[in-house]
């Protein structure tokens, strides 16, 4: 017992959930999630712990508007995994779901939406519409992948230096 003592429990902190992997059994238990506190298990099994608090990640997506003008959106993605579905998330995507799923998906969706607007529309009256479309598409795509997108915030719209120079010279 002394030898295996530290390998027989995991202390799950507030804002975390755990899923258990049975090495000699059926593998990952996707049905049960473990909450905060000390959780015991046999030493050959493993507890995988996920942070389920709301998180924010900054991302920049480079693309072209409907006229082919190079522009970029700097965005903040506010998200968290679905607490009771982290076993499924771990089984289908893994612990690095931000890099494997969220970042590629925001890139694809933002590029698709950006090219439907002109740069002038993006910086003026259509910015909120653009944000809302990206947000709704992300929510729909990732809900079935066990991730909740709370909000997408556009923090900056960036254009190429040549275009910016031409605008300031006018």
Language model segments and positions:
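Hydrophobic membrane-anchoring helix/hairpin
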Residues: 5-114
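Long, charge-rich amphipathic alpha-helical coiled-coil "stalk/tentacle" segments
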Residues: 161-170
């Amino acid at each position: 017992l002394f030898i295996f003592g530290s390998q027989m429990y995991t202390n799950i902190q507030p804002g975390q959930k755990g899923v258990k992997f049975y090495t000699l059994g059926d593998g990952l238990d996707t049905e049960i999630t473990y909450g905060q506190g000390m959780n015991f298990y046999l030493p050959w099994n493993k507890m995988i712990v996920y942070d389920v608090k709301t998180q924010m990640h900054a991302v920049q997506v480079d693309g072209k508007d409907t006229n082919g003008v190079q522009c970029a959106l700097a965005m903040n993605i506010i998200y968290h995994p679905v607490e009771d579905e982290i076993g499924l998330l771990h089984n289908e995507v893994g612990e690095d779901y931000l890099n494997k799923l969220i970042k590629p998906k925001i890139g694809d969706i933002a590029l698709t939406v950006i090219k439907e607007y002109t740069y002038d529309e993006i910086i003026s009256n259509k910015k909120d519409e653009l944000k809302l479309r990206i947000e709704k598409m992300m929510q729909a795509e990732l809900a079935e992948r066990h991730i909740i997108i709370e909000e997408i915030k556009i923090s900056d719209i960036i254009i190429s230096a040549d275009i910016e120079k031409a605008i300031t010279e006018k």
